[in-house]
A protein has these predicted regions:
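Membrane-proximal helix-turn-helix segments that form the acceptor-binding/catalytic region
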Residues: 78, 82-84, 95-117
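Active-site proximal beta-strand in glycosyltransferases
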Residues: 68-91
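Conserved active-site histidine-acidic residue motif and adjacent donor-binding/catalytic loop
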Residues: 206-210, 218-234, 289
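Conserved catalytic-core segment of nucleotide-activated headgroup transferases in glycan assembly
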Residues: 5-8, 143-212, 223
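Nucleotide-sugar-dependent
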Residues: 1-4, 175-182, 227-232, 239-257, ...
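A charged, aromatic-enriched C-terminal amphipathic alpha-helix characteristic of glycosyltransferases
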Residues: 289, 293, 302-339
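Helix-loop-beta element that forms the nucleotide-linked donor phosphate-binding surface
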Residues: 110-111, 116, 123-143
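N-terminal subdomain of nucleotide-sugar transferases
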Residues: 1-29, 48, 187-199
Length: 344
């Protein structure tokens, strides 16, 4: 769901009165998307016309440099992950992939006015690698304030009946994060078989390589547009969150999405933003790689009562994209530093 952030944050900043250009090579000419919001190709960009340039993850900064904008005086770099010079516990990028990310990160530290990260663990690693003089802020993932209501049950079209455990999100590719991809495919297979014994179907959706998934244990539906996604979640009974290992620096964006509809969650303990489940009382946190414990928790949550409206209101107020965009207002309006003290 990381790609959604790119557009949702831009939309939210525009709603807050900022003039925003999304720079992508999808169209030959600029496109007006909404009030104060355009999408333009790189050929139309004049970097010197912008007060601030905000990049999206390592690849966004690489694109900025490649397109001649790396010397802009006010770059805000958003990082989804922070890697170490050496392999670091909790960071699940390895070998040449990690080395390339670190090279980009070093350039970000040298050229960016502000860097934003997702979690406390990522902030600590950034300071360890790049020093405490970096202007660093924590801006977690957000979620849509407005979503479609429930439509027809899409699972029935596929002949899937009964309780659904949903795993929504990227399971990664072999060329970027092979270790997590293979680990998660194995664990989804094991979890699917265990859930099946309890009368629950495990359904997964999102990008990533799925060649090791057992279709008898896990039904993988591929990727969907954000507008299509919500019906699948509305008609699920529990959401699944896997950790990437016994330690994990990255948050899980799917937690924000599950909670937006009050979907109860079974989450593994190493996931940093598991505290949202505790705050909302909507789910269970289980030890890492305890498949039977996950299945037992899912079976209990399928029929658990919860205050869906209260949970949704909480997520909108505290964790919507507009709430996240508001954190940038002091900087973008020249009023001073961004608020500090965020925690996940």
């Amino acid at each position: 769901m990381a790609g959604i952030r790119f557009f949702r944050m831009a939309e939210a900043l525009a709603r807050r009165g900022h003039e925003v250009d999304i720079v992508l090579n999808r169209h030959q000419e600029p496109q007006r998307l909404a009030t104060r919001l355009r999408e333009i190709p790189f050929k139309s960009v004049r970097w010197e016309h912008y007060h601030v340039v905000k990049t999206f993850f390592h690849r966004g900064f690489d694109s900025l440099v490649a397109e001649g904008g790396g010397d802009h005086p006010f770059i805000i770099s958003k990082l989804g992950s922070v890697v170490g010079r050496e392999q670091t516990e909790g960071v699940h990028f390895h070998g040449s992939v990690r080395e390339q990310l670190y090279a980009t990160q070093t350039a970000i530290a040298q050229r960016s006015r502000i860097v934003t990260v997702l979690t406390n663990r990522s902030a600590a690693l950034w300071w360890k690698e790049h020093g405490v003089d970096s202007v660093l802020f924590q801006v977690p993932t957000g979620v849509d304030a407005e979503i479609p209501g429930a439509g027809a049950n899409p699972y029935l079209r596929l002949g899937i009946e009964g309780p659904i455990a949903l795993f929504a999100g990227n399971i990664y590719s072999r060329d970027k994060q092979a270790e997590v991809n293979l680990l998660w495919q194995d664990r989804l297979n094991r979890l699917g078989r265990s859930l099946k014994q309890r009368g629950i179907s495990l359904v997964a959706m999102g990008a990533g390589e799925t060649d090791q998934l057992d279709p008898a244990a896990v039904r993988h539906l591929g990727s969907f547009d954000a507008s299509e996604y919500w019906d699948w979640q509305h008609h699920s009974q529990v959401g699944i969150v896997l950790a990437q290992g016994t330690a994990q620096d990255n948050e899980s964006s799917k937690i924000y999405y599950y909670l937006r509809t009050g979907l109860p969650i079974v989450c593994e303990e190493p996931v940093p933003n598991k505290s949202l489940i505790e705050e909302t009382g909507c789910g269970a946190i289980v030890p890492y790689d305890q498949i039977e414990a996950m299945s037992d928790a899912a079976a209990e949550l399928v029929s658990a009562r919860r205050d869906v409206d209260h949970i949704a209101d909480y997520m909108i107020k505290k964790h919507s994209w507009d709430a996240r965009a508001a954190l940038y207002d002091p900087v973008l309006r020249g009023e001073g530093p961004m608020p500090a003290g965020l925690s996940t």
